[in-house]
Amino acid sequence: MRQIFPADPAGPEIGQAVPGETGAAVPPAVVALAGLYAYPAAGTRPEPWLRANMVASADGAASLAGRSGGLSGAADRLVFSVLRSLADVILVGASTARVERYRPVAGREIWAALRNGRAPTPPIAVVTRELGLDPDGPLLAGAPPEARTIVLTTAAAPAARRAAAARHAEVVVAGPDRLTPATIIGALAERGYRRLLTEGGPSLLTQFNEAGLLDDLCLTISPVLEGGWAGRIHAAPAAADQGGPAGPGAAAGPGTAARLRLAHVLEDDGSLLCRYLRGTS
């Protein structure tokens, strides 16, 4: 893996590493990536700071054979683990959690030395308007006590579902009948989470962007032409299960274009790993 923007002809290749292979030691590749992807220092950034991590094919598809994991390579997986290691909490929509078969973050998947005294692993926070989750599935029931899964839902969710989820997870009612980007972020901020990482899906990313709350986009462009019917990372319709501002079943309009500033580009085996910051300066 090498940095191609900003250009640094004298810079070394970043290399590769796999969590868990080197014990407590942090390989040079991870140190370099942690610096490139560091959250802005406290006092110099909006708080909380919302980062998204997404992957797309060269022709813009957000998934391959129905899952984003089909577009991921070794470099993307390494950055994925570093971003998770740096985050306070990982935010995901319920439909994405189901399709991608989310589980709690395992210690072997991240770099504990990057946690800086926080819980060994970041919790997963799931956004679900109607709480259509398996209360006894691994995502809720398998989380460790220090990083219990957080379920962000509404007062309109069936009481029996809320009670079932609360057996294992922290259930947070963050709205009467829908969840807005501001209430989602506010609920996490109230619990001390400042460095937020969302992994989508596209509907959730769209809502945060159109609310003006997305600060940072990490996008891997995979050297693949999908050529099918997969959607883009920034979706038009609002997913009903995620309680989007547009409401269940409503199609969004043309949306709000957000200007982004390119912070860096890494290249590895044809994959481009880009980081964009909101704004132009």
Residue ranges and their predicted role:
Residues 1-281:
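Enzymes that bind and transform nitrogen-containing heteroaromatic metabolites
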